[in-house]
């Protein structure tokens, strides 16, 4: 990794941590609040690509593991990885990787702005929602003993917010391509 890669990776790890400072939104009818940190995961994949995006998420999870309160609500420590929602944290790594991988394959400089934005959106939807939820729901169903159907239905309340996050990540990805053409290729 070059110095630029290290700086960009650390920057996006810091962005994910900073998004954890935003207060979580409680809906009342579900016990788990909506947080902004999954937006950071999508943004890391879209802007940095598969490898650097996944590394940025790994840095955040390492900070969590050593006990720093960098998750939404000031949470941190190894106990987080034993909670029923730990599958979503593990899913962040793969979500950022898949989002980045798809962004690298679907988006190029020769496309129109609309095609680039839609491609970034699809990458964020697949990596940041489908992959993330596959890990999170499977782990939640297993650890909490809910069964897959209950865990799946309970998680659907988060989909509208995550779609909005995917739109924001797509718009950011397009803005970075236009505004910073010298940013190293996503890899």
Swiss-Prot record:
Protein topology in the membrane: Multi-pass membrane protein
Going by the UniProt record, its keywords in alphabetical order are: Cell inner membrane, Cell membrane, Membrane, Transmembrane, Transmembrane helix, Transport
What is expression of this protein induced or repressed by?
Expression is repressed by biotin.
User: Which stretches are transmembrane?
Assistant: 10-30, 53-73, 78-98, 120-140, 152-172
Q: Which InterPro entries does the record cross-reference, listed alphabetically?
A: BioY (IPR003784)
Query: What are this entry's molecular-function GO terms?
Result: biotin transmembrane transporter activity
Q: What is its main location?
A: membrane
Q: Which GO terms describe its cellular component?
A: plasma membrane
Tell me one Pfam family matched here: BioY
Where is the protein situated, by its record's location annotation?
Cell inner membrane
Q: What happens when the gene is disrupted?
A: Mutant exhibits lower biotin uptake and has a diminished capacity to form nodules on bean plants.
What is said about its interaction partners and assembly? Part of a biotin transporter complex composed of BioM, BioN and BioY.
The family note in this entry says:
Belongs to the BioY family.
This molecule's function is given as: Involved in biotin uptake.
Task: Cite the PANTHER family for this sequence.
Answer: BIOTIN TRANSPORTER BIOY, BIOTIN TRANSPORTER BIOY-RELATED
Q: What is this protein called?
A: Biotin transporter BioY
Gene for this protein? bioY
